[in-house]
Amino acid sequence: MSNETVLPLQFTEAAAKKVKLLISDEENPNLKLRVYITGGGCSGFQYGFTFDDQVNDGDMTIEKQGVELVVDPMSLQYLVGGAVDYTEGLEGSRFIVTNPNAKSTCGCGSSFSI
């Protein structure tokens, strides 16, 4: 039996590595990657990413490789069971969310419906 805590949202090694690189470029070690959900996009909800140096009451933080991912409680309810990853490919490089709660997603993967 494993003692590892199961988190409601995964923060992949690739995403943490990229966040660490971007934070070092900004020269502000207090920055964290914040993922959030807003209304909009072609499917009803859309994912957003920003760097933030604040953690608000109720926010969940996930630490990996010395950097943190921050999620507010409202967004977390739509992201449970998902993962924040970073990918580089023909369509460019970007942070992506794999979300098992999404019933459908748009072609670019930045918006979804539940």
From Swiss-Prot:
Cofactor (UniProt): iron-sulfur cluster
MF terms in GO: 2 iron, 2 sulfur cluster binding; 4 iron, 4 sulfur cluster binding; iron ion binding
Chain residues that bind iron-sulfur cluster: C42, C106, C108
Superkingdom to which the source organism belongs: Bacteria
Keywords noted in UniProt: Iron, Iron-sulfur, Metal-binding
Cofactor comment: Binds 1 iron-sulfur cluster per subunit.
Entry's Gene Ontology cellular component terms: cytosol
GO biological process: iron-sulfur cluster assembly
Signal peptide positions on this chain: none
Assembly behavior: Homodimer.
Family membership noted in the UniProt record: Belongs to the HesB/IscA family.
HAMAP family, per the entry: Fe_S_insert_ErpA (MF_01380)
Function: Required for insertion of 4Fe-4S clusters for at least IspG.
Protein's name in the database: Iron-sulfur cluster insertion protein ErpA
Gene name, Swiss-Prot/TrEMBL: erpA
